[in-house]
Amino acid sequence: MLCHVTRPDAVVMEIEVDAKANGEDCLNKVCRKLGIIEVDYFGLQFSGSKGENLWLNLRNRISQQMDNLTPCRLRLRVKFFVEPHLILQEQTRHLFFMHVKEDLHRGHLRMCSEQAQELSALLAQAEFGDYNQNTAKYWYTELCGSEPNQTTINSIIAKHKALEGLSQASVEYQALQLVSSLEHYGVEWHWARDAEAQRLAIGVGPEGIAICRDDFSLVNRISYPIIQIATQSGKSVYLTVTKESSDSVVLLFKLISNRAASGLYRAITETHAFYRCDTVTNAVMMQYSRDFKGHLASLFLNENINLGKKYVFDIRRTSKEVYDYARRALYNAGIVDMMSRPGERTPSNRSPSREQEGALDCGGCQQSRLLQEKLQKLREALLCMLCCEEEIDAAFCPCGHMVCCQNCAAQLQSCPVCRSEVEHVQHVYLPTCTSLLNLTIGENSPEPIHRGMAAHTCTTNDYSTSEKIYQN
């Protein structure tokens, strides 16, 4: 089966997959061609029969989800946006930048005049290079929604000239840093109508759900902790939300089709799991539906039969797990400088699997690298699982689990491992040699993982809420 996959920069890739292939088979081939290991940030989109934008479920067959397979037309898109400093590969960062440019052009990201001026200069430097009055073009009108006056134009030109000499990679990184500070960065938009048939834009993002009018002016904001349950029925999605008075209210959103409603339900559940949870629970991973044939087979043959089974969600890792997985994968592939520094652009045709292949030829080097990797894993295992900076030196009582430092433990009301209530925190001394943590394991080893994102602290109430979101 032939798949035409359009990248965010409008380049079309031809991907050949088996007729019974799942969505992840196609995505993995695309990312392999691009040299991208951070696959979990991306997804494949297609257009439904009514023009709705739908995510291909990567765990289900492509042929069961799309209407037209001659050829299969898909779009490579960023599904989960993270902070720029958490992106380990230059290729990944470039695709993030191209996707953000498209969102800016569509008006999905709003900003003030000063931000629009700075971003206009950065986009011009990335696209046209150093300032040239004959070639420079600016996006100010698209970014700010108004025509610039001469003073504004002069300010943009001055900012553009100040960027002279900066590489494309450095400028793209700065642009992503600016965009990541905007209100709707990483928000996925769904068009729906409320109970009064008023057209709304429903934005599902890392912090919660934004309900906006047609012009993206905010009507209401719902954070994940106050969502009791999210359900889908036909073309409708229902959100049961706790108000400040502790009463519950049910919000109704009517979408254009059943698949569009399923897309909104998926977005709420998967986005919550990716950004707000420590790991993806089985309640999400194993939720599925069956067609009629599969339902009959499960009744008369075996309840666990895979015939006709379609998974509801395709998320496999949370943001923390993606970062850790990608870092280890890059290190195991022999890449030393995973965090490409701004100003040093990685060639687009460089494959991670071929990085430093000459440096790992001899058996002694391989053995040394394995020992370094084991030592690095030991060091990381002794770090707090929440902040990943301090050593583990606290035990939760009465359960006895030891997974974090005293500073993080003092902020938790329940154990993150067993969810039992914490009565008090006991300071402990792990039976390890302190000098081990200070060993230098060579230049080729990555630094201990220091996450730039704030760890989410789940209380007992928060945990029960997150479980309810996954009900269908």
From Swiss-Prot:
GO terms for cellular component: cytoplasm; cytoskeleton; cytosol. The lineage of its organism: Eukaryota, Metazoa, Chordata, Craniata, Vertebrata. It is found in: Cytoplasm, Cytosol. Its main location: cytoplasm. Its EC number is 2.3.2.27. It comes from Danio rerio (Zebrafish). Pathway: Protein modification; protein ubiquitination. One of its GO terms (molecular function) is zinc ion binding. Ubiquitous. The gene is mylipa. GO terms for biological process: gastrulation; negative regulation of Wnt signaling pathway; protein ubiquitination; ubiquitin-dependent protein catabolic process. This is E3 ubiquitin-protein ligase MYLIP-A. Coiled coil: none annotated. Interacts with anxa5.
